[in-house]
A protein has these predicted regions:
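Short, flexible loop/turn elements at secondary-structure junctions
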Residues: 53, 64, 153-155
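Conserved, mostly hydrophobic/aromatic
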Residues: 60, 85, 89, 149
Length: 174
């Protein structure tokens, strides 16, 4: 049996061609024929999330920069990235960073770590993001800014001390 052939999305040059592909593929997705520029763009419109008004629908998703300090605090690169989140215009910062809750749960030795010692430095990340957002968009621009923090434990994928440590599959030798 041969695998089905799918057209490359880039080959669908018009809205009509894309719509015909969706119909042929029985994919019930509606879309606008023309993209609207802000402020008319649907992505530029506010949205309510759990009773909180978020200023637009642009979102920064959690990521691991692998650029924290060995102690788990933000580095200059981490702070720079968070300032850029602030000036991006996105109003939903959904995690910003994957932050380990325990040393042994860090995915790598440079992942941020939330402890009593690192908490003030991590709180300053948020402050820098809000400050850069205000500088770019005005002093009241953070009223509809929604910021969260993704707390993680990497489980069996944790590598808190070295970058490439082999794991023993079984403690019993064969």
């Amino acid at each position: 049996m041969t695998a089905p052939a799918y057209p490359r999305v880039a080959s669908l040059k018009t809205a009509a061609a894309f719509r015909a592909h969706l119909i042929r593929s029985a994919i019930p997705i509606d879309f606008d024929d023309e993209l609207a520029a802000p402020p008319r763009s649907p992505l530029a419109q506010p949205i309510e999330v759990d009773g909180v008004r978020v200023g637009n629908r642009f979102c920064i998703l959690p990521m691991e920069g692998w650029d924290g300090t060995p102690d788990g605090e933000p580095s200059d690169l981490t702070r720079r990235r968070w300032r850029h989140f602030g000036i991006s215009g996105a109003k939903l910062i959904w995690g910003g960073e994957a932050v380990a809750v325990r040393h042994d749960g860090r995915a790598n030795p440079n992942q941020l770590l939330l402890t009593a010692k690192t908490q003030p430095a991590i709180a300053r990340l948020r402050d820098e993001l809000v400050s850069s957002h205000r500088e770019r968009f005005g002093s009241n621009a953070d009223g509809d800014l929604y910021i969260g923090l993704q707390l993680t434990h990497s489980g069996r994928y944790a590598r808190p001390n070295v970058y490439n440590r082999p794991e023993c599959v079984s403690c019993r030798p064969m």
